[in-house]
UniProtKB/Swiss-Prot annotation:
One of its GO terms (cellular component) is cytosolic small ribosomal subunit. InterPro entries: Ribosomal_bS6 (IPR000529), Ribosomal_bS6_sf (IPR035980), Ribosomal_S6_plastid/chlpt (IPR020814), Transl_elong_EF1B/ribsomal_bS6 (IPR014717). Belongs to the bacterial ribosomal protein bS6 family. CDD domains: bS6. Binds together with bS18 to 16S ribosomal RNA. GO terms for biological process: translation. SUPFAM superfamilies: Ribosomal protein S6 (SSF54995). GO terms for molecular function: small ribosomal subunit rRNA binding; structural constituent of ribosome. It comes from Campylobacter fetus subsp. fetus (strain 82-40). PANTHER family: MITOCHONDRIAL 28S RIBOSOMAL PROTEIN S6, SMALL RIBOSOMAL SUBUNIT PROTEIN BS6M. This is Small ribosomal subunit protein bS6. Transmembrane segments: none annotated.
């Protein structure tokens, strides 16, 4: 099974209970089609970078999951027909480096930027 991340934005007009129902629906689509959910992160309501369908804000949700490849087509179909989802993005993690990042993100850990080696300043050569 492959590692995936699904980010979607719900309409801000939904109540907490309605938003939970939509998140549960997406989780159910994943599990019924052979996927395993690693974690669900509800990021809350945030301001959008630009208006989407007259909305300036949206409720962000990220789901980290493992699934067979054929599940993605069914998941995308269900997300598209859900009117309360105004945008979504599915990301596939492929190589070992990406999968280790997926593991950290799914556990709620932040990724640390690669450390840069600092060179000591060279001493100027004195002329004799």
């Amino acid at each position: 099974m492959k590692h995936y991340e699904l980010l979607f934005i719900l309409k801000p007009t939904l109540t907490e209970d309605e938003a939970k129902v939509k998140v549960d629906f997406i989780k159910e689509v994943i599990t019924k089609n052979g996927g395993e959910i690693a974690s669900v992160i509800e990021m809350g309501t945030r301001k959008l970078a630009y208006k989407i369908d007259k909305y300036e804000r949206g409720t962000y949700v990220v789901i980290y999951f493992m699934a067979p490849t054929q599940l993605i087509a069914e998941l995308v179909r269900n997300v598209r027909i859900t009117e309360e989802i105004i945008r979504f993005l599915t990301v596939k993690y492929e190589n070992k480096r990406e999968i280790s990042a997926w593991d950290k993100l799914s556990k709620g850990q932040k990724l640390m930027p690669a450390k840069k080696e600092l060179k000591a300043p060279e001493k100027p050569v004195e002329a004799e």
